[in-house]
Swiss-Prot record:
Belongs to the NqrDE/RnfAE family. Its main location: membrane. The gene is rnfA. The keyword Cell membrane applies. Part of a membrane-bound complex that couples electron transfer with translocation of ions across the membrane. Its EC number is 7.-.-.-. The chain crosses the membrane at residues 5-25, 39-59, 62-82, 102-122, 134-154, 171-191. This is Ion-translocating oxidoreductase complex subunit A. It is a multi-pass membrane protein. The keyword Electron transport applies. It comes from Haemophilus ducreyi (strain 35000HP / ATCC 700724). It holds the Pfam family Rnf-Nqr. GO terms for biological process: electron transport chain. GO terms for cellular component: plasma membrane.
Amino acid sequence: MVDYILLVISTALINNFVLVKFLGLCPFMGVSKKVETAIGMGMATTFVLTLASLSAYLVERFILIPLDAQFLRTLVFILVIAVIVQLTEMIVHKTSPTLYRLLGIYLPLITTNCAVLGVALLNVNLSNNLIESVLYGFGAAVGFSLVLVLFAALRERLAAADVPRPFQGASIALITAGLMSLAFMGFTGLVKL
Protein backbone atom coordinates (compact mmCIF):
# COMPACT_ATOMS: atom_id res chain seq x y z
CA MET A 1 0.00 0.00 0.00
CA VAL A 2 2.80 2.40 0.90
CA ASP A 3 4.53 1.59 -2.39
CA TYR A 4 1.42 2.65 -4.29
CA ILE A 5 1.20 5.97 -2.44
CA LEU A 6 4.90 6.58 -3.08
CA LEU A 7 4.36 5.78 -6.77
CA VAL A 8 1.67 8.46 -7.04
CA ILE A 9 3.73 11.04 -5.12
CA SER A 10 6.84 10.24 -7.14
CA THR A 11 5.02 10.50 -10.45
CA ALA A 12 3.19 13.71 -9.52
CA LEU A 13 5.99 15.67 -7.88
CA ILE A 14 9.43 14.20 -8.52
CA ASN A 15 9.09 12.86 -12.06
CA ASN A 16 6.48 15.35 -13.22
CA PHE A 17 5.65 14.76 -16.87
CA VAL A 18 5.56 18.44 -17.78
CA LEU A 19 8.53 19.79 -15.85
CA VAL A 20 10.88 16.77 -15.94
CA LYS A 21 9.91 14.69 -18.97
CA PHE A 22 8.68 17.66 -21.05
CA LEU A 23 5.49 15.88 -22.13
CA GLY A 24 2.20 17.76 -22.47
CA LEU A 25 3.75 21.16 -23.13
CA CYS A 26 1.13 22.20 -25.72
CA PRO A 27 -1.83 22.29 -23.30
CA PHE A 28 0.50 23.50 -20.54
CA MET A 29 1.30 26.67 -22.47
CA GLY A 30 -2.03 26.99 -24.30
CA VAL A 31 -4.69 26.43 -21.62
CA SER A 32 -2.90 28.01 -18.69
CA LYS A 33 -4.05 31.61 -19.07
CA LYS A 34 -7.00 31.34 -16.66
CA VAL A 35 -7.26 29.21 -13.52
CA GLU A 36 -10.86 28.11 -14.27
CA THR A 37 -9.88 26.76 -17.67
CA ALA A 38 -6.79 25.10 -16.22
CA ILE A 39 -8.85 23.35 -13.55
CA GLY A 40 -11.31 22.05 -16.16
CA MET A 41 -8.51 20.90 -18.45
CA GLY A 42 -6.77 19.27 -15.49
CA MET A 43 -9.91 17.36 -14.52
CA ALA A 44 -10.52 16.22 -18.09
CA THR A 45 -6.89 15.18 -18.51
CA THR A 46 -6.94 13.34 -15.17
CA PHE A 47 -9.97 11.37 -16.29
CA VAL A 48 -8.46 10.59 -19.70
CA LEU A 49 -4.98 9.73 -18.41
CA THR A 50 -6.27 7.38 -15.73
CA LEU A 51 -8.66 5.61 -18.11
CA ALA A 52 -6.04 5.51 -20.87
CA SER A 53 -3.56 3.84 -18.52
CA LEU A 54 -6.12 1.22 -17.56
CA SER A 55 -7.24 0.66 -21.15
CA ALA A 56 -3.70 0.52 -22.51
CA TYR A 57 -2.74 -2.12 -19.96
CA LEU A 58 -5.80 -4.23 -20.77
CA VAL A 59 -5.33 -3.90 -24.54
CA GLU A 60 -1.63 -4.75 -24.28
CA ARG A 61 -2.17 -7.70 -21.96
CA PHE A 62 -5.27 -9.29 -23.49
CA ILE A 63 -5.10 -8.33 -27.18
CA LEU A 64 -1.64 -7.33 -28.39
CA ILE A 65 0.47 -9.89 -26.51
CA PRO A 66 -1.76 -12.93 -27.26
CA LEU A 67 -1.93 -11.95 -30.94
CA ASP A 68 1.81 -11.17 -31.01
CA ALA A 69 0.96 -7.74 -32.41
CA GLN A 70 3.10 -5.48 -30.20
CA PHE A 71 4.30 -3.69 -33.34
CA LEU A 72 0.82 -2.10 -33.50
CA ARG A 73 1.09 -0.76 -29.93
CA THR A 74 1.40 2.95 -30.76
CA LEU A 75 -1.41 2.92 -33.32
CA VAL A 76 -3.75 0.95 -31.07
CA PHE A 77 -3.00 3.15 -28.06
CA ILE A 78 -3.77 6.28 -30.12
CA LEU A 79 -7.12 4.78 -31.15
CA VAL A 80 -7.94 3.83 -27.55
CA ILE A 81 -7.02 7.34 -26.36
CA ALA A 82 -9.17 8.90 -29.11
CA VAL A 83 -12.19 6.87 -27.99
CA ILE A 84 -11.66 7.86 -24.35
CA VAL A 85 -11.30 11.54 -25.31
CA GLN A 86 -14.54 11.41 -27.31
CA LEU A 87 -16.28 9.90 -24.28
CA THR A 88 -14.84 12.65 -22.07
CA GLU A 89 -15.89 15.32 -24.54
CA MET A 90 -19.48 14.03 -24.54
CA ILE A 91 -19.54 13.92 -20.72
CA VAL A 92 -18.16 17.48 -20.37
CA HIS A 93 -20.57 18.76 -23.05
CA LYS A 94 -23.56 17.28 -21.20
CA THR A 95 -22.51 18.15 -17.63
CA SER A 96 -20.86 21.57 -18.09
CA PRO A 97 -21.55 23.40 -21.36
CA THR A 98 -19.69 26.47 -20.05
CA LEU A 99 -16.52 24.46 -19.41
CA TYR A 100 -16.96 22.76 -22.78
CA ARG A 101 -17.06 26.18 -24.46
CA LEU A 102 -14.09 27.47 -22.43
CA LEU A 103 -11.90 24.48 -23.25
CA GLY A 104 -12.78 24.82 -26.91
CA ILE A 105 -10.30 23.12 -29.21
CA TYR A 106 -8.09 21.94 -26.34
CA LEU A 107 -10.51 19.20 -25.27
CA PRO A 108 -10.27 17.21 -28.52
CA LEU A 109 -6.54 17.95 -28.57
CA ILE A 110 -6.12 15.72 -25.49
CA THR A 111 -6.05 12.96 -28.10
CA THR A 112 -2.75 14.29 -29.39
CA ASN A 113 -1.39 15.24 -25.95
CA CYS A 114 1.93 13.46 -25.90
CA ALA A 115 1.68 13.02 -22.11
CA VAL A 116 -1.31 10.69 -22.50
CA LEU A 117 0.41 8.49 -25.07
CA GLY A 118 3.71 8.77 -23.18
CA VAL A 119 2.18 7.45 -19.95
CA ALA A 120 0.57 4.53 -21.78
CA LEU A 121 3.83 3.59 -23.50
CA LEU A 122 5.91 4.05 -20.34
CA ASN A 123 3.54 1.76 -18.43
CA VAL A 124 4.29 -0.98 -20.94
CA ASN A 125 8.04 -0.30 -20.92
CA LEU A 126 8.17 -0.27 -17.11
CA SER A 127 6.26 -3.59 -17.00
CA ASN A 128 3.76 -2.19 -14.49
CA ASN A 129 0.93 -4.43 -13.33
CA LEU A 130 -2.71 -3.30 -13.53
CA ILE A 131 -2.79 -1.36 -10.26
CA GLU A 132 0.61 0.22 -10.87
CA SER A 133 -0.45 1.23 -14.38
CA VAL A 134 -3.60 2.96 -13.17
CA LEU A 135 -1.78 4.67 -10.29
CA TYR A 136 1.06 5.73 -12.58
CA GLY A 137 -1.48 7.31 -14.93
CA PHE A 138 -3.33 8.91 -12.03
CA GLY A 139 -0.10 10.27 -10.53
CA ALA A 140 0.97 11.67 -13.89
CA ALA A 141 -2.45 13.30 -14.27
CA VAL A 142 -2.36 14.79 -10.76
CA GLY A 143 1.11 16.19 -11.47
CA PHE A 144 -0.03 17.59 -14.81
CA SER A 145 -3.10 19.19 -13.23
CA LEU A 146 -1.13 20.62 -10.32
CA VAL A 147 1.46 22.21 -12.58
CA LEU A 148 -1.22 23.47 -14.99
CA VAL A 149 -3.24 25.19 -12.24
CA LEU A 150 -0.15 26.66 -10.53
CA PHE A 151 1.15 27.96 -13.85
CA ALA A 152 -2.26 29.46 -14.69
CA ALA A 153 -2.34 31.25 -11.33
CA LEU A 154 1.15 32.63 -11.95
CA ARG A 155 0.20 33.78 -15.45
CA GLU A 156 -2.88 35.57 -14.10
CA ARG A 157 -0.63 37.42 -11.65
CA LEU A 158 1.86 38.19 -14.42
CA ALA A 159 -0.91 39.63 -16.61
CA ALA A 160 -1.50 42.31 -13.98
CA ALA A 161 2.22 42.89 -13.33
CA ASP A 162 4.43 45.48 -14.97
CA VAL A 163 6.55 43.17 -17.12
CA PRO A 164 9.20 44.80 -19.34
CA ARG A 165 8.21 44.84 -23.01
CA PRO A 166 10.86 42.32 -24.25
CA PHE A 167 9.67 39.78 -21.67
CA GLN A 168 5.93 40.07 -22.29
CA GLY A 169 3.97 37.11 -23.64
CA ALA A 170 5.69 33.81 -24.31
CA SER A 171 9.05 34.99 -22.97
CA ILE A 172 7.88 35.51 -19.39
CA ALA A 173 5.78 32.34 -19.60
CA LEU A 174 8.84 30.26 -20.49
CA ILE A 175 10.92 31.92 -17.77
CA THR A 176 8.15 31.18 -15.26
CA ALA A 177 7.94 27.56 -16.41
CA GLY A 178 11.69 27.23 -15.95
CA LEU A 179 11.48 28.63 -12.42
CA MET A 180 8.64 26.21 -11.65
CA SER A 181 10.80 23.36 -12.89
CA LEU A 182 13.60 24.48 -10.57
CA ALA A 183 11.14 24.65 -7.67
CA PHE A 184 9.92 21.11 -8.37
CA MET A 185 13.53 19.92 -8.33
CA GLY A 186 13.31 20.54 -4.58
CA PHE A 187 11.15 17.42 -4.32
CA THR A 188 14.05 15.25 -5.53
CA GLY A 189 14.98 12.88 -2.72
CA LEU A 190 11.51 13.07 -1.17
CA VAL A 191 10.78 9.45 -2.13
CA LYS A 192 13.45 6.78 -1.97
CA LEU A 193 12.45 3.55 -3.69
